[in-house]
């Protein structure tokens, strides 16, 4: 079974850097495949839990983007392009290329009827 894991570093000022991985499990062993680096606003970090991800049309950005489902006390938490913590009011930032890659990756999984799970660490 595969799922995704976002491993974050200790906040550095206003920024929290992280890395998104695809996790393959085989027995008790996990194999991590790096997908892309991430950036969050330290003041608005997503709680360390497991979330479902869906790809939907963003009313704000007017394009398909991945969105985290059931984030406690919040809504509309998306993965979108950005390079500085101030580019986010609580979303997860990735490069423009990685935004396209993630959207396509998760859209394909969604069409395949697979549940997309993402663990925040």
Protein language model regions, located:
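Cell wall/extracellular polymer interaction/catalysis modules
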Residues: 1-92, 99-104, 110-121
């Amino acid at each position: 079974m595969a799922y995704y894991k976002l491993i974050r570093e200790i906040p550095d000022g206003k920024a929290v850097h992280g890395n998104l991985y695809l996790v393959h499990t085989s027995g008790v062993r996990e194999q991590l495949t790096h997908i892309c680096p991430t950036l969050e606003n330290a003041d608005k970090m997503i709680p360390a839990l497991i979330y479902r991800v869906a790809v939907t049309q963003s009313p704000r950005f007017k394009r398909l983007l991945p969105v985290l489902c059931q984030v406690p006390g919040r809504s509309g938490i998306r993965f979108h392009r950005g390079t500085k913590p101030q580019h986010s009011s609580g979303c997860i930032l990735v490069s423009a290329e990685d935004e396209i890659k993630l959207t396509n990756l998760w859209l394909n999984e969604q069409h395949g009827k697979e549940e997309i799970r993402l663990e925040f660490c």
